[in-house]
């Protein structure tokens, strides 16, 4: 059998490289079953295992096969496996599992190559080229609150992971900047500030209060309500005075959002509901021409199989709604932005809405019938942020928690903990401030991202700022400690990278090396499943593997110092890339 040299296509991705080897083996072992995909998983009794034997046996046992059972199929897979520098040995376990042990020399060489060529050479390659991630999406004239936290940071992490995996990502902020509520806001603005051109953020003050006061007047004052309804008509009709007032409210709101995004290091391009207005009528017309739109109780609707209530696309008063805007946005993203994968990050409560409008899009022929081919749509639903009482997280006054206040408190608590440890005497005020911010915001993000997004989680500053266990604080400490070990060696790590060699002779060295090499497949899994907690789990276990390595293997002053310093550096690099993908700023000293 010819030797297959490790493929550069999947550098630093043993799982993918093994899949290529076993793909050859499968085609040689069972040439009559050409569509069988290699099933490669991390192994219980080896580094990896191939799980095809049992499935293959069930396919071929009635077809006059030479094999006598799954173990014989597994043995044949081993015999047909091309020789490769990455594989040390293979063996059969149980009912035909093929256990694979990687070559320690190959593992060491792969890590050395990453240290020279950079962590980006380990980035997975996905089959999709361009994706839209629709996330955050607050409503104009309302402040961002704790409910926006999850969409904002989950969406940002998904975008970062896809970008790292060589996907062009269009980060979209689908803000609520249109609708009947603007009539009441504009009319209230006119009453308070007859000269709207001179209105500033300072003059309006707290937008949340402004919104509440206008809503109260709308509910209690019939004359004001009528004016507000007329204002909506004028705004939608393009009246320049009303358009200007609307633009002013949007601008003030946008500036408030920008402050939060800057603090969280979130990049977004706004394409709000109003952006799609010019396209809605044509999209509804296209859906009507395909026979999808029907009249029902004065409204125009699409009936969706499996749902009792239809999807309303034109209200009985002739106005448009969320469904009309969302369908139009999807049409635009597919036809104008040429996106192959459109990902919506919202709470799980909106699941039915997405199910219905995705089915409507399939009915229209915009999307394929299955979820495996492109273009594809995905709803990334997430659970609630809960308080100690297991109910929706609120302030003591039963108010929604403002996101800006939450960020302030995270930073303040982080700073207080650092001062308690005397860091204000060691560091400059600027350093203290920067590190407090990195730790505080990092703790907030990680506590959210480490939870499977589908479930809710209980918000607790005490828990998330704990320096022990699965927290950002613990992980940032671990990274800072690795940096300290390298600094204390007195060696130029960049020079060592060029000439030094890694040996994975000790069991703890090898375990750490294997975990480092599982980084690319972890990012790929987190991207394809749209689950950031997969990456968080990897990062936490990486810090645990490093702790075991450091407890068992002396680094500085040992005979293996160069190799072990390079392992420290590789761990720090992978940790930093994980932090980057999670939107967390690493710290180099704590």
From Swiss-Prot:
Q: Which GO terms describe its molecular function?
A: arginine-tRNA ligase activity; ATP binding
Q: Organism's domain of life?
A: Eukaryota
Q: What is its main location?
A: cytoplasm
Per its UniProt record, what SUPFAM superfamilies does this chain match? Anticodon-binding domain of a subclass of class I aminoacyl-tRNA synthetases, Arginyl-tRNA synthetase (ArgRS), N-terminal 'additional' domain, Nucleotidylyl transferase
As annotated in the record, motif 'HIGH' region runs over 138-149
**Keywords in alphabetical order:** Acetylation, Aminoacyl-tRNA synthetase, ATP-binding, Cytoplasm, Ligase, Nucleotide-binding, Protein biosynthesis
Query: Lipid metabolism: is it a keyword of this entry?
Result: no
Got a GO cellular component term for this one? cytosol
Q: What happens when the gene is disrupted?
A: No visible phenotype under normal growth conditions.
The residues that the entry says bind L-arginine are 137-139, 148, 322, 326, 350
Function text? Forms part of a macromolecular complex that catalyzes the attachment of specific amino acids to cognate tRNAs during protein synthesis.
The entry sums up its family as follows: Belongs to the class-I aminoacyl-tRNA synthetase family.
| NCBIfam families listed in its UniProt record | argS (TIGR00456)
PANTHER family for the chain: ARGININE--TRNA LIGASE, CYTOPLASMIC (PTHR11956:SF5), ARGINYL-TRNA SYNTHETASE (PTHR11956)
The protein's name is: Arginine--tRNA ligase, cytoplasmic
Report the source organism: Arabidopsis thaliana (Mouse-ear cress)
């Amino acid at each position: 059998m010819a030797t297959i040299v490790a493929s550069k296509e999947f550098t630093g991705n043993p799982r993918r490289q093994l899949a290529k080897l076993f793909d050859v083996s499968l085609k040689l072992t069972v040439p009559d079953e050409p569509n069988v995909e290699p099933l490669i998983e991390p192994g219980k009794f080896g580094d990896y295992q191939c799980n095809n034997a049992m499935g293959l046996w069930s396919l071929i046992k009635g077809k006059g096969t030479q094999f006598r059972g799954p173990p014989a199929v597994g043995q044949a897979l081993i015999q047909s496996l091309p020789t490769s520098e990455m594989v040390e040995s293979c063996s059969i376990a149980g009912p035909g599992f093929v256990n694979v042990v990687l070559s320690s020399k190959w593992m060491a060489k792969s890590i050395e190559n990453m240290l020279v060529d950079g962590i980006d050479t380990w980035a997975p390659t996905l089959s999709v080229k361009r994706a839209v991630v629709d996330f955050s999406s607050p409503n104009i004239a309302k402040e961002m609150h704790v409910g926006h936290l999850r969409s904002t940071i989950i969406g940002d992490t998904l975008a970062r992971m896809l970008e790292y995996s060589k996907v062009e990502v269009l980060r979209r902020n689908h803000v609520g900047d249109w609708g009947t509520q603007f009539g009441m806001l504009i009319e209230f603005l006119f009453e308070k500030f007859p000269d709207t051109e001179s209105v500033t953020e300072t003059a309006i003050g707290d937008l949340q209060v402004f919104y509440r006061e206008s809503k109260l007047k709308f509910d209690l004052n019939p004359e004001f309500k009528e004016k507000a309804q007329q204002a909506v008509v004028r705004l939608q009709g393009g009246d320049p005075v009303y358009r200007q007032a609307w633009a002013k409210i949007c601008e003030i709101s946008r500036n408030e959002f920008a402050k939060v995004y800057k603090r969280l290091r979130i990049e977004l391009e706004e394409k709000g509901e109003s952006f799609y207005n010019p396209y809605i009528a044509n999209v509804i017309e296209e859906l009507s021409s395909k026979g999808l739109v029907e009249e029902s109780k004065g409204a125009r609707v699409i009936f969706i199989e499996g749902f009792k209530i239809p999807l309303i696309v034109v209200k009985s008063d002739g106005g448009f709604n969320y469904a009309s805007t969302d369908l139009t946005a999807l049409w635009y993203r597919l036809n104008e932005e040429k996106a192959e994968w459109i990902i919506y990050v919202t709470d799980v409560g909106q699941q039915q809405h997405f199910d219905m409008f995705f089915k409507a899009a399939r009915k229209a022929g915009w999307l394929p019938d299955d979820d495996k081919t492109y273009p594809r749509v995905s709803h990334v639903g997430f659970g609630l942020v809960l308080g100690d009482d297991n109910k929706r997280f609120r302030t003591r006054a039963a108010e929604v928690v403002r996101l800006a206040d939450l960020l302030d408190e995270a930073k303040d608590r982080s700073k207080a903990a650092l001062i308690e440890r005397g860091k204000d005497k060691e560091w400059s005020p600027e350093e203290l401030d920067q590190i407090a911010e990195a730790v505080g915001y990092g703790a907030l993000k990680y506590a959210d991202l480490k939870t499977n997004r589908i479930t809710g989680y209980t918000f607790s500053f005490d828990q998330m700022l704990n320096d022990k266990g699965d927290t950002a604080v613990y992980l940032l400490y671990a990274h800072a400690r690795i940096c300290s070990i390298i600094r204390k060696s007195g060696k130029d790590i960049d020079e060592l990278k060029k000439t030094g060699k890694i040996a994975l002779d000790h069991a703890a060295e090898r375990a750490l090396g294997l975990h480092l090499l599982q980084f690319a497949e972890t990012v790929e899994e987190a991207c394809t499943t749209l689950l950031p907690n997969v990456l968080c789990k990897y990062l936490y276990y990486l810090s645990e593997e490093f702790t075991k390595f450091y407890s068992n293997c002396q680094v500085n002053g040992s005979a293996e110092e160069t190799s072990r310093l390079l392992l420290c550096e590789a761990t720090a690099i992978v940790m930093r890339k994980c932090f980057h993908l999670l939107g967390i700023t690493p710290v180099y000293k704590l």
